[in-house]
């Protein structure tokens, strides 16, 4: 499969990170040395399901990204409900980051100097669905670039046991550390539909009743 072309840093690293962080805390609380006490760690991940999940996310998101890029065609996608571009969107976004706040502290709250630093160009590698790209970007350039990427999370849980069989935290863990499975806020979405359907059936509606 070509699904993981843009994800040489395996997507499942997001799950490894979650497990590692949990075990570090567990080992500290239970007086174990995680790296020298010979512990064997087993998870409920099904390697076949994990590979299918990774390929599904990679294939689907790369396809949707192309549609997204074609639709916006070089225009900024951050718009308000009236369709107008949100003013100072990138500036306000960077201001909420710990990186910006640390720079501001280091530079005596001089925001002009901080933004001068944020706009300095330097060599860096960036993610693309065709593989890593070497480029020359400023921090603000990279923020603009990455804000144009669609994101996703994927988790498969066995209902009877609660075992996690597949976990994909994002499209590429090396470049996007945010884990959409663990850190993302949940919306009810389709999860609520069975409750609505059950209420309708209880009130005599058939599954084929037109609404």
Residue spans for each PLM region:
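Extended, non-catalytic substrate-recognition/exosite surfaces adjacent to catalytic cores, especially
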Residues: 1, 7-211
């Amino acid at each position: 499969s070509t699904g993981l072309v843009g994800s040489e840093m395996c997507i499942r690293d997001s799950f490894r990170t979650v497990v590692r962080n949990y075990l570090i805390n567990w080992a500290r609380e239970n007086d174990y040395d995680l790296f020298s006490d010979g512990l064997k760690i087993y998870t409920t991940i099904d390697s076949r399901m994990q590979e299918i999940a990774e390929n599904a996310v990679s294939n689907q998101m790369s396809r949707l990204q192309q549609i997204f890029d074609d639709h916006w065609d070089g225009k900024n996608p951050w718009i308000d409900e009236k369709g107008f571009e949100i003013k100072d969107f990138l500036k306000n976004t960077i201001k909420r980051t710990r990186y910006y706040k640390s720079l501001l502290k280091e530079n005596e709250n001089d925001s002009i100097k901080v933004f001068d630093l944020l706009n300095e160009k330097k060599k860096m590698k960036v993610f693309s669905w065709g593989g890593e790209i070497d480029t020359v970007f400023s921090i603000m350039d990279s923020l603009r670039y990455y804000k144009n990427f669609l994101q996703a999370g994927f988790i498969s849980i066995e209902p009877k046991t609660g075992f996690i069989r597949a976990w994909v935290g994002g499209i590429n863990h090396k470049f996007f550390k945010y884990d959409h499975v663990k850190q993302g806020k949940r919306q009810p979405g389709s999860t609520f539909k069975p409750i609505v359907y059950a209420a309708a059936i209880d009130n005599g509606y058939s599954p084929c009743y037109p609404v």
